[in-house]
Amino acid sequence: MNEVSRRTILGAPYLALVSKAAAAGDGRIVGHGTHRYRVDTKWCQAKPETHPVNDCHEMVQARDGRLFLFTNHKQNNVLVLDQRGRVIDAWTLGWAGAHGLTIHADAEGREHLYATDTSSGRVVKTTLAGDVVMELAHPASIGVYSDKDVYSPTETAVGPNGDIYVADGYGSQFLLRYDKDGKFLNKFGGKSSQPISKGKFLQAHGVAIDARGEQPLVMATARIRNEFHWFTLEGEFVKTVYLPGAYMSRPVIVGENVYSGVCFGMFADDYRMWQGRGFVTILDRNNRVISNPGGRKPEYRDGRLQLMLQDEPVFHNCHDVCVDQQGDLYVCQWNSGKVYPYKLHREG
């Protein structure tokens, strides 16, 4: 096993340590309660000779069922797959730091992708075929950041009115808000190294729009703190939920549930941050953990969630979860031997 130091995770977009955990074979059942899944590690039929990947960072699904996998291999940043795992298209932005991928349909129903590059600081909107139709201004170029502020965007989300939220997760830890045409509106969040700091981040890794309540909210990951934060659409802090032991990537909200890939984890007798300890975590409408595929069954005592740990090494370092229209999951992994996504077939 390799420990990930706090200094390493905060100091660089990519971690250089290699996990020694081994993925389990096909067929085992993981998860708990109503969310149990059969693991298929061989679902993806892509071949490294023709469609190589480095890290499989994120995946989204279009309305027509196609799956878009985002990888930081410059030959093919995007692999387009059908639900049988076959590659049906591939294209590239030429990015070495391809990281965050979001899909959104506009008021006319047209779907676009929003992509981030942690290396160059680029954030673009593309067609599903890969044509760039808009690029957001770098915050330093419009006076939002100083020349000394680091900008390394990890994720985007699109609000109900088209506002675009950019998580500067490997940079200065702000959430930056632009309107649908790319005009900068405001920023909120920011970095704090204090153990408890409402609305502040240690690695604002992921962001999504949570429309499960009466009013839509911005939901963002504070990964190093094992927390999710919620804000109003304008950036006012609302609440925090703490998931002890889970270094989550981004929140993926489908129906009443939140899904997230846990990239790093702990041991029962070692609370440091380790690679090879990944699993998937699933929350209900009330943001209580109800299932941990690959992890131990969630336990609450006196209303407090207990430490969550990997149960068996099905996964190395989970970086994202895509939920298809049938409720099956596709798990993307970072720094895990260049494996393609695993499919988890819904059983429960």
Region annotations inferred by a language model:
Residues 1-16:
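N-terminal secretory signal peptides and thylakoid transit peptides that target proteins
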Residues 24-41:
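Blade/loop signatures of beta-propeller domains
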Residues 41-50, 134-147, 185-199, 290-313:
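Surface-exposed loop and turn segments in beta-propeller and other repeat-based domains
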Residues 49-64, 94-110, 141-163, 194-217, ...:
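Beta-rich, blade/repeat-based domains predominating
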Residues 69-73, 113-118, 166-169, 211, ...:
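Conserved beta-strand positions in repeat-built beta-propeller and related beta-rich domains
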Residues 76-107, 118:
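Blade-loop segments of beta-propeller domains
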Residues 246-296:
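Loop/turn-rich, solvent-exposed surfaces of beta-rich toroidal or solenoidal domains
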Residues 317-348:
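Blade-level signature of beta-propeller repeat domains, shared across WD40, Kelch, NHL, RCC1
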